[in-house]
Amino acid sequence: MKEVSSLKREDAFYHKIMLMTGLDDGYDEWLNCYLESENPLSNIVLELACCGSDINKTISVLHSFCMEQPFDEAIVCNKVRAFFKDAYYTNRMSKEEISSTMYRLALNVGDPGDFDIHLWGSMYYLNDYCSLAKDGIIPWENFDFAEEVWEQETIHIFSLFCTE
C-alpha cells in the first residue's frame, strides 16, 4: 500500500527554492505544522524532521519528493510573488535586494532560456534592468516594478521600462 502524505509538492518546491536562495520564509513553521497534524507521520515528514539544521540535506529531500510527481508550478509562482510583495511593502527588502534575490531564485529553478513559466525568466532578467537603472542608463522611476510584479500573472520585462 502506497503511503499518502498531506504535504503538497507545490509547498515543498516553494520551500526548496527559497532555502536554495538563502531564505527560509517560514520553513520551520511549515514543517512543524505537519509534524503536529500527521498521525502517523509520513515518510517525507520524517525525512525532513531528521534533516535538522542541515539545509543541504533538507533541499535534497525536498527535491526528491518534488520529482516523484508533477505539480502545478503556477501555484509556486503565486507563493513567490506573495513573498516578494510582502517583503517589498513591509520594507524588509529594497528593490535591489528583491531583484538580486529574484535572480538567484530563478537560477535555482532552471535554465533561463528554458523556463516553462514566464515568471522565472522575468525574474532572471529583472536584475539586469535594476543594474541599468542604478547606472543611470534607464530612468530609476521606470523601475518601480512592484505593482506589475504583484498584480500580473507574469512579469513582462519590456513593458516595465517602456513609458507610453
Range-by-range predicted roles:
Residues 1-164:
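Acidic, Ser/Pro/Thr-rich low-complexity regulatory regions
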